Each structure stands twice: as C-alpha cells, then as structure tokens.
Amino acid sequence: MENCLPRSLEKLQQILQISLEDLPFGCIFCGKLLGAAEKQLFKCTGLCIVWHKGWPYGTCRDCTVLSCALDLYCHLALTAPALEAEALVGQEISSWFMRCTVCGRRLTIPEKIELRARNCTLCCIDKGQYFQWRGHCSSCKLSDQGDLGGYPPSPGSRCGECDECCVPDLTHLTPVDLEELGLYPGPEGTYPDLVDLGPGVFGEEDEEGGGLFDSFEEEDPGPNQCGCFFCTSYPSGTGDTDINQGPAGAAGIALQSDPVCFCENCINFTEFR
C-alpha cells in the first residue's frame, strides 16, 4: 500500500486537486506545520514525502539543515576534491546523484559541473546500503552557512557537562574503497530518498485521531545532562533562557553557539537521505 502512495508534493497535489497553500503538511522531525514558503522550499529541494499513519510529512528548513549536519558528523565516509572523487568513482560528476551538504537540495547539472571546475571538496556520506556524495549548492556556498565553520561543533567535541551524549568522534575513520563498495546505483537500481525515523519520535494519536502534529513535550533534563538538538530539553548552563522549541528553535543556536550534543537515540534513528 505504501509503495502506491505519492512521494512528491507535486504528485500529491495532483491526486488531491488541492493547492500547496491548502495542503496540511507537517515536519516529521519537530511536528510543526510547514508554511507556504517552507512547503515550496521542500518541493524545490527534491526531497520525498514520508507517510505515517496515513498522513504525509516533510521537513522544515531548520530540521533539514540539522539533519544534514548530523549526517556529516555521524555518517561521513571520506572527503575528497572533486577531481579525485571522480577518479575514484569512474563516472563524470555531472551524472551523479548529489545533494547539498548544508541544505539537502538536489544539485543541478550546472552546479555539479561548477564543483568539478573549481575542484571543490566533496563529502561522501555512508547510508548503510549505499553511498551519496554531497557538495555545496550555489546558494549555500555564498551564504554564511556554506562555510564549514558554520556547522555545529567539531567531530569528537563534548559539551563538558555530561557523559550522556556527545558529537561522535570520527577521527579514527579511514577512507573507504568506493570501487569495492559500489557507489551507484542503490540496491534496487534506484537512489533511495527517504527520511528514516526510529521509535518514539511521533506524538501518539488520541481517541479522536488527533495528535499527528503534536510537538515534543517539555522535559526536565535533570542535573548533568545537556540538550540534544532533536530533543526539547534545556541545555545545561543556559540559565533562564528558554530554547525549548524543538529542533526548529534550536537550529539558530546550533549554528552559532558553543559546542552542543546529539543524544544516542537521534544519532541512531534520525537519518536524512
């Protein structure tokens, strides 16, 4: 049944005969309803719809950026200049399926050609059953977020307040032999493009069927615990500052604050593809 459900906003609009503005569409990470601008951005980014309990979900801009950063820190296989990466794969970069390292948008052929011409550094993300190369899109490379220094904390850093969670240490990783692993295509001859989530992320439905777009409940983090980007705890040392707004509220802080953490559940279950 799920295989028959539309995976793009455009297809869903055609089936429902509804405008983008009138389509109820929530973020699968933080649960908020996307506005018209964010729905249009999701559509242009080329991401796929995720279905849960009969409802379509996407991702808001903030959660998409954080999910890309989480991919970079938790699933990075190697980085390589564009020409070197092209030699490893044995295919022209223009034929690759690529997404932006920062915003997740699917790169156009001109953008991929420019990455090759400038010999930009590319990131190879290990998605378990397949690999995906990423580079900066034309928009992100011109913005502040396009600088690697604008990402959340460096790999291996800790918050200093707890032992519960930390940014994974990737310093021990070695380059992967992509030719042996097989970069393209995916297991079924296609490029999977799906947000995968683990248990306990969604709000439960009540007896009347509501709760599909519920946000996370506020929790007391207790002593010696810091806040994960994808949880709504108060990070240690924030005093009376209220940033208990889920990942959407934490995104602005994450991209310009001191080191913060990802909890183990988010590292294991939150994947952006």
Swiss-Prot record:
Subcellular location: Host cytoplasm; Host nucleus
Cystine pairings recorded for this chain: none
Pfam family, one: E6
Highest taxon of the lineage: Viruses
Keyword Coiled coil part of the UniProt annotation: no
UniProt KW keywords: Activator, DNA-binding, Early protein, Host cytoplasm, Host nucleus, Host-virus interaction, Inhibition of host innate immune response by virus, Metal-binding, Modulation of host cell apoptosis by virus, Transcription, Transcription regulation, Viral immunoevasion, Zinc, Zinc-finger
InterPro entries with a match to the protein in the record: E6, E6_sf
Molecular functions (GO terms): DNA binding; zinc ion binding
Positions of unnamed zinc fingers: 27-63, 100-140
Principal subcellular localization: host cell
Protein family membership: Belongs to the papillomaviridae E6 protein family.
Subunit structure: Forms homodimers. Interacts with ubiquitin-protein ligase UBE3A/E6-AP; this interaction stimulates UBE3A ubiquitin activity. Interacts with host BAK1.
Function: Plays a major role in the induction and maintenance of cellular transformation. E6 associates with host UBE3A/E6-AP ubiquitin-protein ligase and modulates its activity. Protects host keratinocytes from apoptosis by mediating the degradation of host BAK1. May also inhibit host immune response.
Name of the molecule in the record: Protein E6
Species for this entry: Cottontail rabbit papillomavirus (strain Kansas) (CRPV)
Gene name of the encoded protein: E6
